[in-house]
Amino acid sequence: SSAASDVYKRQARNSSATNKNSLYDSYLRAFRWSIDRIGTHGVMAFVSNGGWIDGNTADGVRLSLDDELSDIYVYNLRGNARTAGDVRRQEAGNVFRDGGRTTIAIIIAVKREIPDDVCIHYRDIGDYLSADEKLAIVDRSTFDNIDWQIIDPNIYGDWLNQRDEDFETWPVLGDKNSDDIPAIFKNFSAGLKTARDSWCYGSTPSAVTSQMQTLITVSYTHL
């Protein structure tokens, strides 16, 4: 689809990750679609999975947002249940309760007709808060009373937990793109991958059935 193509061209292309499958998630496609539909100026807003805020794979997403938007407001509501120990207790409640296990974030972004340097406004809601406490805080929040932190991203697309520049000088485990970079492993593989995940799920059983039938038909024509 054109949305998937745009994700590849503008977000996946800028990512330093080898496995870019997570960049084709629906919410990231929605970001890309919205920025394109805004045109020269406008506003977009989403409540989304927040893994893109600091995920290594999402560096291309952040670089794309930095490059194309003027003001970005990110309210990190935390709630990541895919953690353990004290980190899990810090993440605490998810605002979608049993309906969500990932970090939840609110993003509001402005694109101006005259390009200028992006300003990233970030707020972490805090540690050890229940879902009810988080929702109460959000209910009382306005742009004016939120204590925004201004983020100065680095050239690698890091917003939070920015990497040490010396990291780039370390040997890599492996590199398929260059023989000049010192690497520990010369040959390596991620194993067998179908790369057909997006065909295998949908909003209804009939939609999944239709997608799978199409996939099988097309596959047979190429045998």
Predicted features along the sequence, with ranges:
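Sequence-level detector for compositionally biased, low-complexity segments
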Residues: 17, 33-223
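Amphipathic alpha-helical segments in well-structured domains
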Residues: 5, 27, 58-62
